[in-house]
């Protein structure tokens, strides 16, 4: 890795892309010059549209890829057209919608409602092989499946509705067993906790169905399109597929997604499923087609809803069966066996009610007599039951219907009765007799005094006492963690030394060497000997230093104001009050010479009372007064100068105010501003007809008057006070007590006609004080921290850890720099680690660290900061501040390299930025592991989350355990934004109407329409989710909500009238605080939610009123539309509006690189077109066109020559002052005038930009302009004040965009989510451009937080552009995300952990141990015992999860011993180094090593005739081991393709026996250890075991069960079981096909074939191939270090990696490696 890669100007190896030039057809006749530069540049990757690898658009320079043509952009067709004939081919139609197997948890957990088709769920549950349909099924099994299926979604925050279509009853009724199973399941649900969620509809044409979808806008419908299996029903008459397909298709046409009800895997923090995305569908005949496929039988629905039969009359299931049997018998259709079967049903019910799931059955009789009569009688009974169940009223019913029917029990009893055996248990004879009589049965039952049906369940042998294989364990750590190890036994116990050591075998037979694999960043850099190379390196460092300074200054905005003076000793640090007595004497806890203070005191001078002043103090005081007087005179001169700037005076004085130091000059400055603002309003907005304009214009004036009254009154002179009072009174407000306004002021010529309370609420929300308690604190410089921020400083001073939760832009990051400063001051060796979630944030932190701490004198060979990512490192082991990503810190913490261990021992603090990533990223488990592994204090900075207390509870408990109670984690939770957010929605024309042909469209007079968040609420969603806790209305919105509620309720109008509520008289100088505003808001919210349950009519009225302004826009967006086209059509109109209203700079977020670039170009093209058009006008030609430029050049030269002559001669004393060069140079003057005239066609940010910074950035970028097209494009865009930012840009381009936007040279920036996580890019407006799947509520909160940043804006704007109605609702109504605990560890992670703990102790230069085994074991113990999942998962409440984790650790140790990767003591051995190095391959890594140890690869290579064949053979194996991309369910294999597989064929036959042996051993061990986790030692849940179809040996744990039959509290995660099933099947027994993209690409090398044949989106293809190539590289390096250089496997892997990498780079136009 390059040492300077993070900041190097040169492109990374993947950044320079050469592509063929192909024209891009833009929708305009004339293309300005900027469009031409884009003809070669089309970004290939759409990073969010279906990309599973990187939802957050990870900013890897390596992902810069270009397209050959528009088709290769991988855009999905926006519109699907279906004729009536095509509609009949429904499966083919569904296959045209984008479908992928992905993590869908962000689509529903805590954010959205989804729907589940219960009819389909019943069909799919019934399809599981562990059902016993030979005996008409068992209610317990089916109902338990449904309960478990629903509960797993409830556990992760899912909210859903269960939908039933009554017309399907006709289909179900064709089979009695199926009909009864459905009715029983529906009755069970109606009588359970989900009763309110159960909704009935006739069919998809039902108006109520349409209303539900419109009211709830669910995220998706969960449904399968498959028919019932033959195992359940052999009848060919039943065909549910057509109806299910029409339901799914209908939902997709309504802009709602579909999740298929098979292969759904609910893990700890993810839900994997087949997800079908909707598109715009044009199908004129759809409604007719839909109606033709449904009966529209309203009678069936009425039967379901009639509730004629009160079920509270039945106390037990036996009571219900008596009623059923009586009704059935009354039909007179029963045969001779009816009474016997009925008696068996009643007795079965009594037995099951007594025994529950722990029941036994009679053995199956070989002489059983079950003729057709029995089947007819069973149908008669079950049909009678269906009639009752379908009309059941479950109100007040306590009847448990979960175990209504057990066919196995019924038939076993029936067979015994038919054989005249005694069956009736003695204890049940009285109860049975009662029911026997009620049912009118005549068949007698003999009493069984032995009560066989009540025999105890056979005891289960402890799974740990007879393991299939057992290895010795001597590690004290693992024995303490898993005490059950002591009782583990096996008949196949393996004694040490009795099994062939694979490593020794390979050393002896193949001369393998097993060299250690050292981290590249830990290797010493080679010393540069060559003088020229040394000079070049020094120049590079100098250049980097200049770049650091430039970047840092743009980042912080205050230049050297934040630069820390390390010669200064900070004053005041916090200590725990009860510990102050001792530490006051010693000074412990602070820096050298630092004075202590009480927590939160702020270090204010003069806090201690002094008895008297010394002479020295008096002299110092006199000197200070003299100095202040000089400062005051200087500042007054500046103010006077500002007052002389005419129209610009207010702007000048406003900018000057923040730089003034003295209170009297600050007061004078505010006074002068107020006077000038008042004069402007008097001149321009006087008169009653301009009152509304005057109200808006007076906001700044009122704010400055407020400052005069509140802050500066004591420092104003009398005349100034009088003038301030006059201004106040002239606005229509009462004069302050004791003041006398002038007669002119009393005329109130500027009367606003509104009192102060209402004025602040309606117009002046920015005037409302946040009351954050800012105070000067000597511990920080440059600003006064708020109260909650001082708590953060106190926490660091006390040496505690802290969890800091605050909204984006609240100001929580600065504490990390205080922490860094403290460590830098205390030592030259100690280290602070800053963990960032993205490399964009890494660059920012580097800049901030340099800006603040570059003055520190570092030891020789040590840098201030270093960076470490997976792609590059810079001074990683030679720095005091390491800035890294989670994966790399984990590698550091568990490294066994001595140099790395020594570095880790110096880590004193770790800062985790954006720690909420613990539940929102693919690396979330690593965040959790790091928080447990580190043994030093930490700061965890997080955005607002839902379960902050749960997160704090976990962190605090683990921290106290790690520190033996000496440290704790302080929770600092702050919820207030500094800037209000005003929401609005883009005003568009109907996207489904006719196109007016305009290039840049505009709908009406307003470009945007204000959006009240409550305007998108729906009553049902409010009931389920309530109002988000963090949703804070603006002052205007609070007033609006009050007005709407007051309209419909007089009590609310009186009780919450603002003036009355605040207890203030509005005509006086009343200043509302933010806390008072929140008090009013919360009171209104509380009343609002009360009405939701008590008076829904009021709620509907209010919501209708609030929705009215945006109702049209919401209806436009309710149907699918071409989102990209809408954004492109309206972007110019929108930016024009923002520019006119002064709401730039703006960031437009689009998680699609192509969209970012397209919108930027569209906007720039229009500005250029306008400029060219203006240059053709007479005005331009007459005023600004430069004519005869050559003559002007000559004239300017002549003037300069004359000036030079005069300078050389004697100066004429009488001559006037010398003229400026511009005055002498007419051409320069004309050019300047021209530039000012054309400035209107450019966009500028804050303060108009900095020309010097712009020139430096352009110069820096132009170095790569010859070879990089995107640089040329950006330079053209920069000229217009426009930019874009995404992961495809290299470091230089991204840095330039960030610097120029912060400096104001860019006003509009189009960005992917690279700028969403903590990057400092303050703007006034945030636009959400084109919707993508990855735009989650959490991401929305982070992105919108960019708007109205503190210190820049009083308020910010959020605009929804091409966002569908359903997504707008989801973003605004979603609850705060609740973080879930991750699976704590995997087998490979435990290998790394065990090897780290049990390594030999390393000594430093002084002969001391860097770390001891005891210390390492203690760190591992905290990780093993304190998983976050223990605090978040239901299974942990009874200790089952804790036991499961212990058993998993013991299983992992046994498996690693079996693979010879660990010694009995736990030391890594043999190929452990390689396994750890290649751990990214997960399960494939372990299997690869197993096969390698068995020399399988060598045998395979020998079986091929050529090297090329060997490479293909090994590649096929590796594709099977390391790729797991599923084909869609609609995929149909084509046999017309040559050389490609499309779907993986599986492993060569040579390897299959070894893989089967490995899988059998691993699975057998896993089953035993997991069974030991259960309460009774049984792997299977007894509710499923009753079917008699479960067998521990035959049931596959890798099968895609919809509901696995494992014990109830088993915590499932696919990462736990380290096997690969190459014949994996779903719950219906269908083989799951895997995509052969990795193999096929090597064969054809074409990305187009990957899209056309393998069905990959181009962005997905890039990431998949990149990851696979990375795995090949790691395997090649690993085997190279293990084997001899000329080993056949080494040669094949190295050649394979080389060839694969070349093909990959060539296919995607990337620069090949040297």
UniProtKB/Swiss-Prot annotation:
Keywords: ATP-binding, Helicase, Hydrolase, Nucleotide-binding, Nucleus. SUPFAM superfamilies: P-loop containing nucleoside triphosphate hydrolases. Disulfide bonds: none annotated. GO terms for cellular component: cytoplasm; nucleus. Its EC number is 3.6.4.-. A motif (DEVH box) lies at residues 913-916. Residues 47-70, 584-616, 1197-1223 are annotated as: Disordered. It is found in: Nucleus. InterPro entries: DEAD/DEAH_box_helicase_dom (IPR011545), Helicase_ATP-bd (IPR014001), Helicase_C-like (IPR001650), P-loop_NTPase (IPR027417), PIN-like_DDX60 (IPR055124), SKI2_subfamily_helicases (IPR052431). Gene3D superfamilies: P-loop containing nucleotide triphosphate hydrolases. The keyword Amino-acid biosynthesis does not apply. ATP binds at residues 607-614, 806-813. Its main location: nucleus. Residues 1237-1391 form the Helicase C-terminal domain. Residues 607-616, 1199-1218 have a biased composition (Basic and acidic residues). GO terms for molecular function: ATP binding; helicase activity; hydrolase activity; nucleic acid binding. Residues 793-963 form the Helicase ATP-binding domain. It holds the Pfam family Helicase_C. Belongs to the helicase family. SKI2 subfamily. This is Uncharacterized helicase C28H8.3.
């Amino acid at each position: 890795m390059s040492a300077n890669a993070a900041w190097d100007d040169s492109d990374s190896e993947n950044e320079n892309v050469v592509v063929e030039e192909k024209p891009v057809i833009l929708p305009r006749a004339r293309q300005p010059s900027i469009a031409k530069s884009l003809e070669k540049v089309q970004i290939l990757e759409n990073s969010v549209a279906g990309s599973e690898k990187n939802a957050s658009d990870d900013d890897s320079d390596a992902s810069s890829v270009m397209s050959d043509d528009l088709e290769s952009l991988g855009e999905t067709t926006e519109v699907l057209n279906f004729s009536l004939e095509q509609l009949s081919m429904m499966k083919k139609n569904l296959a045209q919608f984008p479908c992928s197997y992905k993590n869908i948890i962000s689509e529903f957990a805590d954010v959205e409602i989804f729907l589940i088709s219960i009819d389909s769920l019943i069909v799919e549950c019934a399809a599981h092989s562990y059902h016993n349909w030979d005996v008409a099924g068992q209610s317990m099994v089916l109902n338990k499946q449904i309960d478990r299926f629903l509960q797993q979604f409830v556990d992760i925050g899912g909210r859903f509705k269960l939908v039933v279509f009554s017309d399907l009853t006709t289909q179900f009724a064709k089979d009695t067993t199926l009909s009864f199973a459905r009715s029983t399941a529906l009755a069970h649900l109606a009588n359970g906790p989900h009763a309110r969620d159960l909704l009935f509809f006739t069919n998809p044409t039902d108006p109520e169905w349409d209303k539900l979808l419109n009211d709830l806008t669910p995220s998706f419908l969960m449904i399968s399109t498959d028919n019932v299996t033959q195992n359940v029903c052999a009848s060919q008459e039943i065909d549910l597929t057509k109806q299910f397909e029409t339901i799914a298709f209908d939902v997709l046409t309504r802009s709602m997604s579909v999740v298929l009800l098979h292969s759904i895997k609910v893990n700890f923090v993810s839900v994997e499923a087949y997800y079908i995305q909707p598109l715009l569908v044009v199908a004129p005949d759809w409604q007719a087609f839909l109606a033709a496929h449904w009966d529209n039988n309203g009678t069936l629905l009425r039967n379901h809803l009639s509730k004629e039969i009160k079920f509270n009359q039945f106390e037990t299931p036996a009571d219900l069966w008596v009623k059923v049997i009586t009704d059935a018998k009354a039909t007179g259709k029963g045969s001779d066996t009816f009474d016997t079967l009925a008696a068996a049903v009643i007795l079965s019910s009594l037995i099951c009610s007594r025994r529950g799931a722990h029941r036994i059955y009679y053995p199956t009789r070989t002489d059983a007599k079950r003729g057709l009569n029995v089947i007819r009688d069973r149908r008669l009974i079950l049909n009678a039951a269906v009639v009752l169940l379908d009309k059941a009223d479950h109100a007040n019913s306590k009847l448990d219907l979960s175990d209504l029917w057990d066919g196995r029990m019924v038939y076993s009893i029936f067979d015994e009765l038919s054989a005249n055996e005694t069956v009736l248990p003695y204890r049940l004879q009285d109860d049975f007799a009662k029911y026997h009589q009620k049912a009118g049965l005549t068949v007698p039952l003999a009493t069984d005094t032995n009560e066989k049906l009540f025999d105890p369940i056979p005891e289960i042998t402890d799974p740990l006492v007879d393991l299939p294989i057992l290895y010795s364990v001597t590690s004290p750590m693992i024995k303490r963690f898993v005490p059950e190890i002591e009782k583990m036994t096996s008949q196949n116990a393996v004694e040490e030394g009795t099994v062939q050591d694979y490593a020794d075998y390979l050393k002896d037979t193949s001369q393998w060497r097993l060299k250690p694999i050292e981290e590249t960043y830990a290797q010493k850099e080679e010393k540069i000997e060559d003088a020229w190379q040394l000079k070049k390196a020094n120049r590079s460092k100098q250049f980097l230093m200049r770049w650091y300074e430039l970047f840092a200054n743009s980042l912080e905005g205050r230049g050297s104001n934040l630069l820390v003076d390390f010669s200064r000793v900070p004053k005041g640090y916090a200590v725990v009050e009860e510990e102050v007595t001792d530490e006051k004497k010693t000074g412990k806890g602070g820096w050298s010479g630092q004075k202590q203070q009480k927590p939160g005191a702020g270090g204010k001078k003069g806090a201690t009372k002094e008895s008297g002043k010394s002479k020295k103090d008096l002299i110092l005081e006199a000197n200070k007064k003299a100095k202040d007087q000089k400062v005051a005179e200087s500042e007054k001169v500046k103010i006077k100068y500002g007052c002389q700037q005419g129209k610009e005076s207010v702007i000048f004085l406003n900018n000057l105010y923040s730089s003034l130091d003295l209170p009297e000059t600050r007061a004078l400055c505010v006074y002068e501003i107020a006077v000038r603002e008042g004069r402007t309003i008097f001149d321009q907005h006087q008169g009653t007809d301009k009152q509304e304009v005057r109200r808006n214009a007076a906001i700044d004036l009122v704010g400055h008057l407020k400052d005069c009254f509140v802050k500066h009154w004591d420092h104003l002179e009398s005349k100034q006070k009088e003038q301030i009072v006059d201004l106040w009174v002239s606005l229509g407000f009462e004069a302050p007590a004791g003041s006398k306004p002038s007669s002119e002021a009393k005329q109130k010529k500027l009367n606003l006609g509104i009192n102060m309370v209402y004025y602040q609420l309606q117009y002046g929300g920015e005037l409302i004080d946040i009351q954050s308690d800012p105070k000067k604190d000597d511990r920080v410089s440059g600003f006064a921290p708020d109260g909650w921020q001082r708590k953060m400083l106190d926490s660091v001073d006390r040496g505690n850890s802290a969890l800091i939760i605050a909204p984006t832009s609240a100001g929580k990051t600065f504490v990390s720099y205080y922490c860094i400063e403290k460590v830098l001051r205390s030592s030259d060796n100690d280290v602070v680690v800053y963990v960032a979630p993205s490399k964009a944030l890494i660059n920012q932190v580097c800049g901030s660290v340099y800006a603040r701490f570059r003055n520190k004198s570092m030891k020789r060979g040590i840098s201030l900061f270093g960076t470490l990512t997976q792609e590059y490192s810079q001074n990683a082991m030679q720095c005091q501040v390491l800035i890294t990503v989670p994966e790399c810190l984990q590698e550091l913490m568990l490294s066994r390299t001595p140099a790395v261990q020594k570095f880790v021992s110096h880590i004193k603090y770790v800062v985790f930025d954006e720690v909420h990533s613990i539940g929102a990223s693919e690396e979330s488990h690593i965040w959790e592991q790091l928080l447990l592994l580190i043994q030093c204090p930490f700061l965890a900075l997080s955005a607002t989350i839902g379960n902050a207390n749960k997160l704090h509870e976990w962190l605090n408990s683990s921290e106290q355990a790690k520190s033996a109670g000496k440290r704790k984690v302080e929770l600092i939770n702050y919820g207030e934004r500094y800037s209000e957010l005003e929401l609005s929605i883009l005003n568009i024309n109907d996207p489904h109407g006719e196109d007016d042909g305009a290039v840049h469209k505009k709908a009406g007079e307003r470009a945007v329409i204000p959006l009240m968040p409550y305007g998108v609420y729906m009553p049902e969603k409010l009931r389920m989710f309530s109002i988000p806790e963090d949703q804070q209305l603006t002052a205007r919105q609070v007033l609006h909500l009050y007005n709407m509620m007051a309209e419909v309720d007089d009590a609310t109008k009186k009780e919450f009238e603002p003036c009355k509520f605040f207890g203030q008289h509005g005509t006086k100088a009343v200043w509302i605080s933010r806390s008072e505003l929140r008090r009013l808001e919360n009171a209104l919210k509380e009343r609002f939610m009360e009405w939701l349950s008590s008076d829904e009519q009021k709620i509907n009225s209010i919501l209708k009123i609030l929705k009215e302004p945006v109702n049209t826009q919401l209806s436009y967006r309710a149907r699918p539309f071409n989102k990209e086209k809408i954004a492109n059509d309206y972007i110019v109109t929108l930016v024009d509006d923002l520019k006119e209203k002064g709401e730039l700079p703006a960031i437009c977020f689009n998680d699609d690189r192509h969209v970012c670039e397209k919108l930027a170009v569209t906007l720039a093209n229009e500005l250029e077109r306008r400029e060219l058009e203006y240059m053709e006008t007479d005005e331009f030609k007459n005023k600004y066109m430069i004519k005869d430029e050559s003559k002007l050049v000559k004239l300017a030269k002549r003037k300069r020559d004359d000036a030079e002559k005069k300078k050389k001669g004697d100066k004429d004393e009488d001559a006037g002052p010398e003229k400026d060069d511009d005055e002498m140079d007419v051409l320069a003057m004309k050019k300047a005038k021209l530039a000012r005239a054309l400035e209107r066609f450019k966009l500028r940010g804050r303060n108009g930009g900095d020309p010097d910074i712009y020139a430096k950035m352009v110069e820096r970028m132009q170095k790569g302009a010859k070879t990089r097209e995107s640089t040329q494009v950006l330079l053209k865009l920069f000229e217009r004040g426009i930019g874009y930012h995404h992961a495809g840009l290299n470091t230089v381009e991204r840095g330039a965009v960030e610097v120029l936007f912060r400096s104001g040279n860019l006003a509009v920036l189009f960005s992917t989510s690279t700028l969403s996580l903590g990057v400092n890019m303050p703007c006034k407006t945030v636009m959400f451009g084109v919707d993508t799947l990855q735009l989650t509520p959490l991401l929305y909160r982070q992105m919108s937080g960019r708007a109205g940043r503190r210190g820049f804006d009083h308020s910010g704007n959020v605009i929804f552009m091409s966002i569908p109605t359903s997504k707008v609702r989801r973003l605004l109504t979603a609850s705060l995300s609740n973080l879930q605990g991750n699976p704590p560890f995997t087998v490979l992670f435990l290998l790394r952990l065990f090897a780290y703990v049990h390594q030999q102790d390393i000594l430093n230069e002084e002969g001391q141990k860097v770390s001891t085994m005891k210390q390492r074991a203690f760190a591992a113990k905290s990780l093993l015992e304190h998983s976050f999942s223990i605090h978040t998962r239901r299974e942990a409440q009874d200790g089952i999860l804790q036991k499961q984790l212990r058993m998993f650790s013991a299983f992992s140790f046994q498996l690693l011993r079996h693979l010879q990767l660990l010694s009995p003591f736990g030391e890594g051995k043999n190929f452990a180094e390689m396994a750890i190095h290649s751990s990214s391959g997960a399960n494939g890594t372990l299997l690869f090593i197993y096969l390698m140890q068995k020399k399988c690869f060598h045998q395979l290579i020998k079986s091929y005739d050529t090297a090329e064949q060997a490479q293909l053979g090994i590649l096929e194996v590796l594709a099977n081991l390391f790729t797991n991309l599923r084909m869609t369910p609609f995929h149909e294999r084509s046999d017309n393709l040559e050389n490609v597989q499309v779907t993986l064929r599986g492993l060569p036959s040579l390897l299959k026996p070894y893989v089967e042996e490995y899988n059998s051993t691993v699975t057998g061990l896993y089953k035993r250890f997991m069974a030991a986790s259960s309460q009774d030692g049984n792997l299977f849940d007894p509710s499923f075991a009753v079917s008699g179809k479960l067998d521990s040996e035959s049931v596959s744990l890798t099968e895609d069960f919809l509901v696995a039959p494992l014990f109830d509290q088993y915590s499932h995660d696919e990462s736990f079981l380290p096997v690969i099933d190459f014949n994996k099947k779903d719950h219906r027994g269908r083989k799951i096909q895997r995509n052969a993209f990795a193999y096929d690409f090597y064969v054809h090398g074409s990305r187009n074939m990957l899209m056309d044949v393998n069905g990959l989106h181009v962005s997905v293809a890039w990431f998949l191939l990149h990851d696979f190539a990375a795995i090949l590289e790691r395997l090649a390096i690993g085997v190279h270090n293990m084997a001899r250089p000329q080993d056949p496997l080494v040669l094949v892997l190295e050649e394979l990696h080389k060839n694969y990498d070349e093909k990959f780079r060539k296919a995607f136009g990337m620069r090949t490696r040297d």
